[in-house]
């Protein structure tokens, strides 16, 4: 169908074309166009840059149309399959669904970690480009970068109030950043002999734990920056450290294929968990809300009665996810389905689901009660390295070797 412009629209378009030709140095073309379009020599100021603005607006609209079409296709598919609509699902049942709300670019190397701020509508990404970026996850806007590390930033963590951000790096350092006002680095801590791979705050916020390729875990006092404890026991690179919400215990995982649970106030290892057949890449503590789903799934497996927990999930290069009762050192269930290394884990705040990120480029949503993968999102163009689930808002974020951070809406 031929589109017909009004006389006024034609005049405005001609003025915009003349401005574009003049601004970009096409003098001969401009002279010819002016004669043929019967234009005056001066272009009105209001037409300055108009052609470019119209062009970019069209591109934005096309992208929006494509996103809406993808959402419509997804909705139609769910209706056909008999899935419940958003109105019938409670927030505890909302899960991330394609397409992504935002795909954020700016990092110049692989994303190593993505986390939500505990209070504000912000998220943080760490990268092998040695920077940390802050984003608004509700608008997709880039806020600022934190620079100071001289090698890959491996992990980031907030204290409970979100006033401090801790980061660790392959440059062997741990840094503390003021996240309230200045966004400056306020402390740098040295002591590890190799790549520092993970960092986590103790819930009270007065100590930070770090895990390293030097096979140790260290505890640092926030106020002074001094190392006050060193935990030893792993036989290989310690990949991740995560503290239980109560703060009395923390867990670590390693290339030695084990997970260890430690007492925070002593240097003692409470339990060593063995069942994985390859490096354990990631761990995540289950919220209290997950206890009933885990117990039901475990009861169907082994009939050993009610488990008290606390419960811990682990993801490995053996492509499996395991759920453990750390009080007795028992693996309660194994989730299989990924086609490559499992790199990130996050529990749904409602406790029914677990989401995982993998080198198979997917995010998978696991129904814990039924021990099955209920949704697969083909999330990135390269390995998925990290994932986080917001505790209060219906959002999931993921990071990848493809250098993008993606925001997924749950519904």
From Swiss-Prot:
Coiled-coil region(s): 56-83
Residue span(s) of domain LisH: 9-41
Protein name (database record): Lissencephaly-1 homolog
Sequence similarity: Belongs to the WD repeat LIS1/nudF family.
Functional description taken from the UniProt entry: Positively regulates the activity of the minus-end directed microtubule motor protein dynein. May enhance dynein-mediated microtubule sliding by targeting dynein to the microtubule plus end. Required for several dynein- and microtubule-dependent processes.
SUPFAM superfamilies: Lissencephaly-1 protein (Lis-1, PAF-AH alpha) N-terminal domain, WD40 repeat-like
Regions crossing the membrane: none
The keyword Cell cycle is annotated on this UniProt entry: yes
Cited InterPro entries: Dynein_regulator_LIS1, G-protein_beta_WD-40_rep, LIS1_N, LisH, PAC1-like_LisH-like_dom, WD40/YVTN_repeat-like_dom_sf, WD40_repeat_CS, WD40_repeat_dom_sf
Annotated Gene Ontology cellular component terms: axon cytoplasm; cell cortex; dendrite; dynactin complex; dynein complex; growth cone; kinetochore; kinetochore microtubule
GO MF annotations, alphabetized: dynein complex binding
Main location class: cytoplasm
GO biological process: border follicle cell migration; centrosome localization; centrosome separation; chorion-containing eggshell pattern formation; clathrin-dependent endocytosis involved in vitellogenesis; dendrite morphogenesis; establishment of mitotic spindle orientation; germarium-derived cystoblast division
Keyword Secreted: no
Location(s) in or outside the cell: Cytoplasm, Cytoskeleton; Cytoplasm, Cytoskeleton, Microtubule organizing center, Centrosome
Keywords: Cell cycle, Cell division, Coiled coil, Cytoplasm, Cytoskeleton, Microtubule, Mitosis, Repeat, Transport, WD repeat
WD repeats by residue range: 106-147, 148-187, 191-230, 233-272, 275-334, 337-376, 379-411
Free-text comment about domains: Dimerization mediated by the LisH domain may be required to activate dynein.
């Amino acid at each position: 169908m031929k589109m017909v412009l009004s006389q006024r629209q034609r005049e405005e378009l001609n003025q915009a074309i003349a401005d574009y030709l003049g601004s970009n140095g096409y003098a001969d073309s401009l002279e010819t166009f002016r004669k043929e379009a019967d234009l005056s020599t001066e272009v009105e100021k209001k037409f300055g840059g108009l052609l470019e603005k119209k062009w970019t607006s069209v591109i934005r609209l096309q992208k929006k149309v494509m996103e809406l079409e993808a959402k419509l296709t997804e909705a139609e598919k769910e209706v056909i399959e008999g899935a419940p609509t958003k109105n019938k699902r409670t927030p505890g049942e909302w899960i991330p669904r394609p397409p992504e709300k935002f795909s954020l670019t700016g990092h110049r190397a692989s994303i190593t970690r993505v986390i939500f701020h505990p209070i504000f509508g912000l998220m943080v990404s760490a990268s092998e480009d040695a920077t940390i970026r802050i984003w608004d996850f509700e608008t997709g806007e880039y806020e600022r970068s934190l620079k100071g590390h001289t090698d890959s930033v491996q992990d980031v963590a907030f204290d409970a109030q979100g006033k401090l951000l801790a980061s660790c790096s392959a440059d062997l350092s741990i840094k503390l950043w003021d996240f309230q006002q200045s966004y400056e680095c306020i402390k740098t801590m040295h002591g590890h002999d190799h790549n520092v791979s993970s960092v986590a705050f103790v819930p009270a916020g007065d100590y930070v734990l770090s895990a390293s390729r030097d096979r140790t875990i260290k505890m640092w006092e926030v106020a002074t920056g001094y190392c006050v404890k060193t935990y030893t026991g792993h036989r290989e690179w310690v990949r991740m450290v995560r503290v239980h919400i109560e703060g009395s215990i923390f867990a670590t995982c390693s290339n030695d294929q084990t997970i260890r649970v430690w007492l925070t106030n002593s240097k003692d290892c409470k339990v060593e968990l063995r069942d994985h057949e390859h490096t354990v890449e990631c761990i995540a503590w289950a919220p209290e809300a997950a206890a009933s789903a885990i117990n039901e799934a475990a009861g169907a497996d082994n009939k050993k009665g009610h488990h008290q927990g606390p419960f811990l999930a682990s993801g490995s290069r053996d492509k499996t996810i395991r759920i453990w009762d750390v009080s007795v050192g028992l693996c309660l269930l194994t989730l299989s389905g990924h086609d490559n290394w499992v790199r990130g884990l996050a529990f749904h705040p409602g406790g029914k689901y677990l989401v995982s990120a993998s080198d198979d480029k997917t995010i998978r949503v696991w129904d814990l009660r039924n021990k099955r993968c209920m949704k697969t999102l083909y999330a990135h163009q390269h390995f998925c390295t990290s994932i986080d689930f917001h505790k209060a808002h219906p959002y999931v974020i993921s990071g990848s070797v493809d250098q993008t951070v993606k925001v997924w809406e749950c519904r």
